[in-house]
């Protein structure tokens, strides 16, 4: 079964996210558990935690199909100690918020070397950052999102995801989220080589590590390494790819999350994607 949703607003409190997801016809969703543009946020209140859990139960959202996203400020591969320490503390806080909410996944962008350290040194720092957070938490899987490779962002090549996973001590608590826009603009031509691209992912990383996907069309061309999302079917990826993806059983039983640019289209996009599973 396909679990399809979008990255919904948690404005006013995390407890509103499941309500917003239900209203667009979703059976999965993503959210920020805190303000994603601030380093420090107020702790979650007991009321918010209770209401979030109640609303998830009320609208039928299981933790396996909720994919929270961490703050954009965090860089787990930061080349400088101050930035690294700050990022690690913020990431741990995000993991602990997921624990409090009974969530099982935390999606994050791996990190950037900022042209100050080598790719491998940065990847080593990312893996160590994950290990430190996993040691201090229970039950939450760190889900590495592949990137477009914009600027000095890492995670745009499958081998880099594998490199990080290889260095994470608790393999049961690390996973991957594939973003369709990022995969395309990173240079993986799944329009012409669908079987080869996902075959390569299976061989290099392994589908056992795939915990979710972000379903986004792309405003930018294949291999551009520029991250600009578009609405489903309106960008350079197009409808046919998503139709194929929806019929592919390898993507069953995980959150498939829209981060497309026009949220007024989300109910329509979710309904269309669901139709393609028939």
Swiss-Prot record:
Residues annotated for Zn(2+) 3 binding in this entry: 182, 227, 229
Cofactor: how bound: Binds 3 Zn(2+) ions.
A Gene Ontology biological process term: base-excision repair
Record field: catalytic activity: Endonucleolytic cleavage to 5'-phosphooligonucleotide end-products
GO molecular function (one): phosphoric diester hydrolase activity
Record keywords, A-Z: DNA damage, DNA repair, Endonuclease, Hydrolase, Metal-binding, Nuclease, Zinc
SUPFAM superfamilies xrefs: Xylose isomerase-like (SSF51658)
Annotated Zn(2+) 1 binding sites: 69, 109, 145
Protein family (similarity comment): Belongs to the AP endonuclease 2 family.
Task performed by this protein: Endonuclease IV plays a role in DNA repair. It cleaves phosphodiester bonds at apurinic or apyrimidinic (AP) sites, generating a 3'-hydroxyl group and a 5'-terminal sugar phosphate.
Protein's UniProt name: Probable endonuclease 4
Gene behind the chain: nfo
């Amino acid at each position: 079964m396909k679990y399809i949703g979008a990255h919904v607003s948690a404005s006013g409190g995390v407890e509103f996210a499941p309500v917003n997801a239900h209203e667009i016809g979703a059976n999965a969703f993503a959210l920020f558990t805190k303000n994603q543009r601030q380093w420090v946020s107020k702790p979650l209140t007991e009321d918010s935690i209770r209401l979030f859990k109640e609303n998830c139960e009320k609208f039928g959202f299981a933790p396996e199909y909720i994919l929270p996203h961490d703050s954009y400020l965090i860089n787990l591969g930061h080349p400088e100690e101050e930035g690294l320490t700050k990022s690690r503390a913020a990431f741990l806080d995000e993991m602990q918020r997921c624990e409090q909410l009974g969530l099982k996944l935390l999606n994050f962008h791996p990190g950037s070397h900022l042209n100050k350290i080598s790719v491998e040194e940065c990847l080593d720092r990312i893996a160590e950052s994950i290990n430190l957070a996993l040691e201090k938490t229970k039950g939450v899987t760190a889900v590495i999102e592949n990137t477009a490779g914009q600027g000095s962002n890492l995670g745009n090549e499958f081998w880099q995801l594998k490199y990080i996973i290889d260095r994470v001590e608790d393999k049961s608590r690390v996973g991957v989220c594939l973003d369709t826009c990022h995969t395309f603009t990173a240079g993986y031509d799944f329009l012409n080589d669908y079987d080869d691209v996902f075959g390569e992912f299976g061989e290099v990383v392994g589908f056992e590590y795939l915990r979710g996907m972000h379903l986004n069309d792309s405003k930018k061309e294949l291999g551009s390494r520029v991250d600009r999302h578009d609405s489903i079917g309106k960008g350079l990826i197009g409808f046919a790819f998503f139709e194929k993806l929806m019929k592919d059983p390898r993507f069953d039983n995980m959150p498939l999350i829209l981060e497309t640019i026009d949220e007024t289209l989300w109910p329509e996009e979710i309904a269309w994607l669901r139709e393609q599973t028939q």
